[in-house]
From Swiss-Prot:
Coiled coil: none annotated. SUPFAM superfamilies: RuBisCO, small subunit. Keywords: Calvin cycle, Carbon dioxide fixation, Chloroplast, Photorespiration, Photosynthesis, Plastid, Transit peptide. RuBisCO catalyzes two reactions: the carboxylation of D-ribulose 1,5-bisphosphate, the primary event in carbon dioxide fixation, as well as the oxidative fragmentation of the pentose substrate. Both reactions occur simultaneously and in competition at the same active site. Although the small subunit is not catalytic it is essential for maximal activity. Pfam families: RbcS, RuBisCO_small. One of its GO terms (cellular component) is chloroplast. Residues 1-58 form a transit peptide. Heterohexadecamer of 8 large and 8 small subunits. Belongs to the RuBisCO small chain family. This is Ribulose bisphosphate carboxylase small subunit, chloroplastic 5.
Length: 179
């Protein structure tokens, strides 16, 4: 019993003699003063101080902000010629995507009916016939687009490349715009 009391008292004195943990590590005193760093200042001499890429860039307008709205893929290019359109559709078919034609009289997203997105805000277009499963040539798609244009002359018409395995739309571009 005496030995256990001696042991307890020796532990207590050891605990009191141990220094506080805060004094083992130096406390954070903040950042060094600014006077320790050398100061170099450039004098403003005009445009020569601005960053430059050697003057190779010329200013160009991206698109006119009035009267020419942009759509999806390829909308920043000029209107596709028939040859370019055929090449794009051949690319779509070559990748195994199913061509599908859609049309809309509105053509743009507008929130006239409600503040939240929905069916009637122009986001969803009407499908022209069924998706062209088994389509092997771009000429078939162009023929269907011309038929849709004949039926709805005031409509926007787009071609969609649909991947029926992953069930996603892979490409979409406008083929006809109203005049």
């Amino acid at each position: 019993m005496a030995s256990s009391a001696t042991m307890l008292s020796s532990v207590a004195t050891a605990a009191c003699a141990a220094p506080a943990q805060a004094s083992m590590v130096a406390p954070f005193v903040g950042l060094k003063s600014a006077s320790a760093f050398p100061v170099t200042q450039k004098t403003a001499t005009g445009l020569s101080t601005l960053p430059s890429n050697g003057g190779r860039v010329q200013c160009m307008k991206v698109w006119p902000i009035v009267g020419l709205k942009k759509f999806e893929t390829l909308s920043y290019l000029p209107t596709l010629s028939v040859e370019s359109l055929l090449k794009q559709i051949e690319y779509l078919i070559r990748n195994g995507w199913v061509p599908c034609l859609e049309f809309s009289l509105e053509g743009f997203v507008s929130r006239d009916n409600n503040k939240s997105p929905g069916y009637y805000d122009g986001r969803y277009w009407t499908m022209w016939k069924l998706p062209m499963f088994g389509c092997t040539g771009a000429a078939q798609v162009v023929k269907e687009a011309a038929e849709c244009k004949k039926e709805y002359p005031a409509a926007f018409i787009r071609v969609i490349g649909f991947d029926n395995v992953r069930q996603v739309q892979c490409v979409s571009f406008i083929v006809e715009k109203p005049e």
